[in-house]
């Protein structure tokens, strides 16, 4: 779990996301409160529930990007889902309980990779010994029993091979080694809502097959990686990992629900059953409030999982959500539409900005691209103008505009090796102005 302060979390998000300081502050405080809660006495800790967040803002302003970056910072079980993928229990489609099952699966994977990484050094030593046993088989006596290497001669040979192995001199040598056979996958088609039963049947068939060894021929470099994974897996206790993963989900889990505005009931609709809108909201209530969900790894309580919902709310408003769900999302954060100045900063400030990406891509062909300050300003203004005159899709418009601008260079790059191309205001005007000015053309092309 991350121990960063709210200010550190916000400044880390600043490296990738421009503006939206209110949203950054809200998620930074929420993430820090997870750590604060764990410092309390157990009796009080149980009473402190997370304050769930609702992010409201037009498309392309950074709602999903904040969630994506938060997942990397949190070092905690995290899942992002679209609310539109779910239907009410009893109807065809995914149930909302599958959110917690998927979150638990990702937690098991995360905890397992951490445990394997912790045991990697020991696993590498064991893998080294197994490869050396293949290269220099231990001597056997007349009864076929392996003797201990007591003489100095085999030991010296083994040490010489060990040195070569560590220096990479034997990487391309091919050996035959016994590795655990991959269990045969059993695909079971089941109706929606029966995923749990399907998982249990698949696990049962895999366990019936047992763990068999299979001789495989491969290069030492490749074999070493596979043996390290196999030996590291033997050093971890699966049951212990499952319990750690369930604890991590219950205490630190974060669920990001995108497109929550699409499950609002809009005015003037028929009064029939609304299984993919209001029905989904009703099913989300117990999850957000706190309930126990059955997963293949065990029972998971959702009382202390943090839920962050987001939506554009262009044709609906947060008040269109059912009142019970509104009450369970107490923190509201409004994200602002992006300006031309924001677009200019997006093109230059983030660690992997679009301009840096294009420069790196063209550098692979030996073409050097330079963006002048007035060129960047012109690109930002063009993108903003198209957003104003057509649909406002936020920062995603920059992808469209830049792709159009770079199309000619990308196509001819392999024939322009060694050239340096300056993209200034004049170049942008020449390639984009006609499209930007013509509203009908920009509607279909940009």
Swiss-Prot record:
Keywords: ATP-binding, Chaperone, Cytoplasm, Nucleotide-binding. It is found in: Cytoplasm. One of its GO terms (cellular component) is HslUV protease complex. ATP binds at residues 18, 60-65, 258, 324, 396. GO terms for molecular function: ATP binding; ATP hydrolysis activity; peptidase activity; proteasome-activating activity. GO terms for biological process: protein unfolding; proteolysis involved in protein catabolic process. CDD domains: RecA-like_HslU. Its main location: cytoplasm. NCBIfam families: hslU (TIGR00390), PRK05201.1 (NF003544). A double ring-shaped homohexamer of HslV is capped on each side by a ring-shaped HslU homohexamer. The assembly of the HslU/HslV complex is dependent on binding of ATP. PANTHER family: ATP-DEPENDENT CLP PROTEASE ATP-BINDING SUBUNIT CLPX-LIKE, MITOCHONDRIAL-RELATED, ATP-DEPENDENT PROTEASE ATPASE SUBUNIT HSLU. ATPase subunit of a proteasome-like degradation complex; this subunit has chaperone activity. The binding of ATP and its subsequent hydrolysis by HslU are essential for unfolding of protein substrates subsequently hydrolyzed by HslV. HslU recognizes the N-terminal part of its protein substrates and unfolds these before they are guided to HslV for hydrolysis. Belongs to the ClpX chaperone family. HslU subfamily. This is ATP-dependent protease ATPase subunit HslU. It comes from Proteus mirabilis (strain HI4320). The gene is hslU.
């Amino acid at each position: 779990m991350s121990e960063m302060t709210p200010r550190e979390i916000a400044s880390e998000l600043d490296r990738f996301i421009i503006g939206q300081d209110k949203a950054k502050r809200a998620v930074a405080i929420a993430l820090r409160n997870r750590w604060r809660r764990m410092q309390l006495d157990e009796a009080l800790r149980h009473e402190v529930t997370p304050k769930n967040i609702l992010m409201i803002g037009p498309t392309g302003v950074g709602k999903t990007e904040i969630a994506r970056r938060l997942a990397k910072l949190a070092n905690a079980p995290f899942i992002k889902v679209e609310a539109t993928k779910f239907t009410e229990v009893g109807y065809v489609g995914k149930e909302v309980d599958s959110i917690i099952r998927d979150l638990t699966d990702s937690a098991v994977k995360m905890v397992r990779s951490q445990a394997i990484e912790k045991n990697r050094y020991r696993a590498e030593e064991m893998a080294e010994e197994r490869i050396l046993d293949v290269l220099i088989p231990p001597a056997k006596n007349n009864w076929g029993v392996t003797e201990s290497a007591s003489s100095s001669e085999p030991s010296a040979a083994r040490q010489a091979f060990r040195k070569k192995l560590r220096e990479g001199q034997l990487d391309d040598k091919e050996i035959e080694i016994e590795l655990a056979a991959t269990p045969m996958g059993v695909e079971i088609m089941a109706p929606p809502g029966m995923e749990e039963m399907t998982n249990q049947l698949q696990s049962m068939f895999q366990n019936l097959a047992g763990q068999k060894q299979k001789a495989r021929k491969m290069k030492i470099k490749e074999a070493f990686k596979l043996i390290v994974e196999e030996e590291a897996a033997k050093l971890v206790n699966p049951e212990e990992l499952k319990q750690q993963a369930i604890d991590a989900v219950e205490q630190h889990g974060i669920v990001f629900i995108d497109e929550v505005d699409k499950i609002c009931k809009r005015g003037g609709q028929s009064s029939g059953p609304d299984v993919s809108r209001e029905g989904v909201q009703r099913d989300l209530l117990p999850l957000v409030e706190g309930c126990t969900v059955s997963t293949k790894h065990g029972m998971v309580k959702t009382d202390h999982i943090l839920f962050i919902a987001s939506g554009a709310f262009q044709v609906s408003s947060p008040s269109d959500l059912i009142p019970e769900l509104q009450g369970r999302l107490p923190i509201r954060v409004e994200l602002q539409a992006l300006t031309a100045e924001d677009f200019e900063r997006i093109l230059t400030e983030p660690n992997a900005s679009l301009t840096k990406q294009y420069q790196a891509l063209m550098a692979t062909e030996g073409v050097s691209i330079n963006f002048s300050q007035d060129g960047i300003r012109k690109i930002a203004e063009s993108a903003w103008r198209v957003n104003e005159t057509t649909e406002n899709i936020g920062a995603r418009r920059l992808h469209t505009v830049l792709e159009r601008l770079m199309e000619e260079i990308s196509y001819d790059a392999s024939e322009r090796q060694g050239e340096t191309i300056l993209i200034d205001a004049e170049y942008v005007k020449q390639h984009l102005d006609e499209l930007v000015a013509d509203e009908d053309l920009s509607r279909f092309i940009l």
